[in-house]
């Protein structure tokens, strides 16, 4: 008799043309991911060729029980690193039966911003640094930390190696490879300043694809931690006190910024971000006030600042960008639990469309 592992790893393409499509969507909290699978008659590579589907929105906090149907619109396809073969992961957004985006569907508005001629012509690039914390399942305490106690002070853990400094690398490396397999433009990983905390980077990605890729990378991470029996937290300050928080620094450039003379465009864009600081902060994640304290490589939440190579600023410009007179900048304000659809489209809207 086949073992469970053998059955999990069955290669369907040996015996059938049919494939499994895992439809993924964002749940009622705006941060929880949900998914369910369906059988398709054969391989699909174009999301517009996929059928719409529905789910019980009353069970995800997105619809009342008496009118519970929410419709899934397939938007992006990735290879499935769990089922392999021709099987796929499908990132969807959510609509009412009448075709209206539901309140938690932030992709719809982002796609409108990115498809506007002003923004599309600037080809906005994003590189998103997603930090997260691995927790022991039953006690919600960081991986590698003594139960009820604390590890030694921060210092040796950032990009550290060794059993006393690095906790959960097997999860991190599995996630890295699974994202590459899926077709996500994951560009790197590293251990973070707080033990049990890690980061992966997605990008450069253009426009709406940045949000799609970050959400599916989060989904894959949740699935891998599920297998490992570990909990992943995107809380921006999981442990109070003298420990680093978790952010989602967002690196950004437009075609004008990448061309000669781009540094002046960058400075103009940063000035616009300063003028809309409060609006951006309110959209940059829940609980960010616990993280943006002016300590632990953050700027104070109430004060906008920018600087070259300054990791204590709201916005950092790299030394290389300053020297070359063109390049990109990093918005360091977004929290680890931010919605990448909101953050990426808002940065584009403020810096390209908005007129002070």
Curated annotation (Swiss-Prot):
Give the tissue specificity: Highly expressed in leaf blades, at intermediate levels in spikelets (rice flower) and at lower levels in roots.
The subcellular localization recorded is: Cytoplasm
What InterPro entries does the record point to? Gln_synt_N (IPR008147), Gln_synt_N_sf (IPR036651), Gln_synth/guanido_kin_cat_dom (IPR014746), Gln_synth_cat_dom (IPR008146), Gln_synth_gly_rich_site (IPR027303), Gln_synth_N_conserv_site (IPR027302), Glutamine_Synthetase (IPR050292)
Q: Where is the GS beta-grasp domain?
A: 19-99
Q: Please give a single GO biological process term from the UniProt record.
A: glutamine biosynthetic process
Could you list this entry's UniProt keywords, alphabetically sorted: ATP-binding, Cytoplasm, Ligase, Nucleotide-binding
The disruption phenotype is: Plants show marked reduction in leaf blades elongation, plant height, panicle size and grain filling.
Q: What else is known?
A: Plants overexpressing GLN1-1 exhibit a poor plant growth phenotype and yield, and decreased carbon/nitrogen ratio in the stem caused by the accumulation of nitrogen in the stem.
Q: Can you say what this protein is called?
A: Glutamine synthetase cytosolic isozyme 1-1
Annotated organism of origin: Oryza sativa subsp. japonica
């Amino acid at each position: 008799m086949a073992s469970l592992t053998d059955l999990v790893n069955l290669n369907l393409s040996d015996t059938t043309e049919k494939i499994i499509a895992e439809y993924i969507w964002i749940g009622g909290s705006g941060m929880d991911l949900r998914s369910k699978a369906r059988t398709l008659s054969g391989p699909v590579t174009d999301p517009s060729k996929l059928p719409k589907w529905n789910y019980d929105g009353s069970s995800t906090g997105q619809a009342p029980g008496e009118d519970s149907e929410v419709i899934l619109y397939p938007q992006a396809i990735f290879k499935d690193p769990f089922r392999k073969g021709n099987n796929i992961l499908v990132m969807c957004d959510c609509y009412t039966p009448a075709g209206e985006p539901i309140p938690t569907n932030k992709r719809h508005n982002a796609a409108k911003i990115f498809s506007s001629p002003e923004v599309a012509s600037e080809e906005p690039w994003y590189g998103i640094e997603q930090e997260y914390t691995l927790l022991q399942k039953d006690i919600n305490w960081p991986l590698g930390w003594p139960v009820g106690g604390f590890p030694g002070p921060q210092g040796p853990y950032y990009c550290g190696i060794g059993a006393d400094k690095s906790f959960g690398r097997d999860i991190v490396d599995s996630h890295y490879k699974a994202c590459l397999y899926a077709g996500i433009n994951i560009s790197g990983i590293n251990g973070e300043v707080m033990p049990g905390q890690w980061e992966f980077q997605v990008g450069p990605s253009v426009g709406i694809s940045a949000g799609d890729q970050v959400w599916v990378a989060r989904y894959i991470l949740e699935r891998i931690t599920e297998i490992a029996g570990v909990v992943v937290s995107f809380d921006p300050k999981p442990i109070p006190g003298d420990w680093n928080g978790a952010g989602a620094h967002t690196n950004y450039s437009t075609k004008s910024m990448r061309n000669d003379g781009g540094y002046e465009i960058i400075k103009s864009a940063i000035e616009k971000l300063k003028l809309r600081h409060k609006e951006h902060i309110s959209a940059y994640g829940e609980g960010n006030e616990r993280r943006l304290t002016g300590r632990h490589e953050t700027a104070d939440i109430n004060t906008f600042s920018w600087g070259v190579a300054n990791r204590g600023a709201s916005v950092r410009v790299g030394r290389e960008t300053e020297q070359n007179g063109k390049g990109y900048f990093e918005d360091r304000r977004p929290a680890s639990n931010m919605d990448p659809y909101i953050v990426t489209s808002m940065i584009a809207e403020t810096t390209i469309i908005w007129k002070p």
